[in-house]
From Swiss-Prot:
InterPro entries: Cecropin. Residues 45-70 form a propeptide. The gene is ASCEC-1. It comes from Ascaris suum. Residues 1-13 form the signal peptide. GO terms for biological process: antibacterial humoral response; antimicrobial peptide secretion; defense response to bacterium. This is Cecropin-P1. It is found in: Secreted. Keywords: Antibiotic, Antimicrobial, Secreted, Signal. Has antibacterial activity against several Gram-positive and Gram-negative bacteria. Is weakly active against yeasts. Acts by a nonpore mechanism. Its main location: secreted. It comes from the Eukaryota. GO terms for cellular component: extracellular region.
Length: 70
C-alpha cells in the first residue's frame, strides 16, 4: 500500500511540476512578445476584449436618443 502511495505521489508531483513549468514558459513568452511589440511601437494586443465597433453599434441601438423620447 505504501509503495502505491509513493508511486502516485511521484507521478502527481511530476505532473504538477510539468504543468507549472508550462505555465511559467507561457507567461514568459507573453511578456517577451509584449516587450517586443512595445519596442517596435505597434498597437497593444488585448485579450478577450470585444470589438469596439460592435459595442458602439449595440449601445447606439439600445440607448434612446432625446428626439425619440419627446
Amino acid at each position: 500500500m505504501f509503495l502505491i502511495y509513493l508511486f502516485v505521489q511521484t507521478a502527481e508531483s511530476s505532473w504538477l511540476s510539468k504543468t507549472a513549468k508550462k505555465l511559467e514558459n507561457s507567461a514568459k513568452k507573453r511578456i517577451s512578445e509584449g516587450i517586443a511589440i512595445a519596442i517596435q511601437g505597434g498597437p497593444r494586443r488585448r485579450r478577450f476584449v470585444a470589438e469596439q465597433d460592435a459595442i458602439h453599434s449595440r449601445v447606439s441601438r439600445e440607448v434612446p436618443t432625446l428626439s425619440d423620447s419627446v
